[in-house]
Amino acid sequence: MKIIILKFGGTSVGSLNRIKKVCKIIISYIKKNYKVVVVSSAMSGVTNDLIKKSNQISNNFPNSEKDVLLSVGEQISCALIAGKLNEMGYTSRSWMAWQIPILTDGAHSASRIIKIKRTKIINYIKGGGIPVITGFQGININNRITTLERGGTDASAIMCAKFFNANKCIIYTDVDGVFTTDPNLLNSAKKIKEISYDEMLEMASLG
């Protein structure tokens, strides 16, 4: 069984038309006989809007509740992707981090993934389903939703690749590959040809 993780960033799912294109990309890998696991960010702008709302309603909004609030962004994009895939004739459903579960430790708004339980997702893809997983979040020992550190959705995808023994992990973003720094900010950024899961996790945690 060939497993591929496809991670889509906020720009990639930033509009309904872009989500339709994302679904075509997913199907292209299904046709190549891959079992596809999708990890999605929130639509671009949604997370910032939710943060703005939390700041407007309270000057001291608890991080635990902010995590619950911010987790909604990824749920929206995942539901839209899964809904479109079903319309196109494919079995798909959105998976919240707590349903899998994706286990985290650390402080609210800055947690790290420590384990992803395999059973439900592996059984689902074996049955022909396309899971669409919320990135950037997990649940802690108290069964509370937590959000990850900067670069959290990339980290979610990389950890999925590790725990699901994926053959490939492809991250769709607004730059062409992995760079030493943001090429949109510095012309001196260099493209990295090859990188390990551990190195990717370290880079993702640093944003």
PLM features: residue spans?
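Nucleotide/pyrophosphate-binding catalytic subdomain
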Residues: 1-207
